[in-house]
Amino acid sequence: QRMCPKILMKCKQDSDCLLDCVCLKEGFCG
């Protein structure tokens, strides 16, 4: 199971996101 805090963060790439979150195509981490 991925560790991804439920925080709405804008991103351009996966490395902009916290822990195991990835950058979704909507432009937010998830």
Curated annotation (Swiss-Prot):
Pfam short name (any one): Squash
A GO-annotated cellular component: extracellular region
Main localization of the protein described in the UniProt heading: secreted
Database matches in InterPro entries: Prot_inh_squash (IPR000737), Proteinase_amylase_inhib_sf (IPR011052)
GO molecular function: serine-type endopeptidase inhibitor activity
Keywords, sorted A to Z: Disulfide bond, Knottin, Protease inhibitor, Secreted, Serine protease inhibitor
Domain of life according to the entry: Eukaryota
CDD domains cross-referenced by the UniProt entry: PlantTI (cd00150)
Stored Gene3D superfamilies: 4.10.75.20
SMART domains: PTI (SM00286)
Subcellular location: Secreted
Site (Reactive bond): 6-7
Disulfide bond annotation, renumbered to this chain: 4-21, 11-23, 17-29
Coiled-coil residue windows: none
Family the UniProt entry places it in: Belongs to the protease inhibitor I7 (squash-type serine protease inhibitor) family.
Function: Inhibits lysyl endopeptidase and trypsin.
Domain notes: The presence of a 'disulfide through disulfide knot' structurally defines this protein as a knottin.
This protein's name: Trypsin inhibitor 3
Species for this entry: Cucumis melo var. conomon
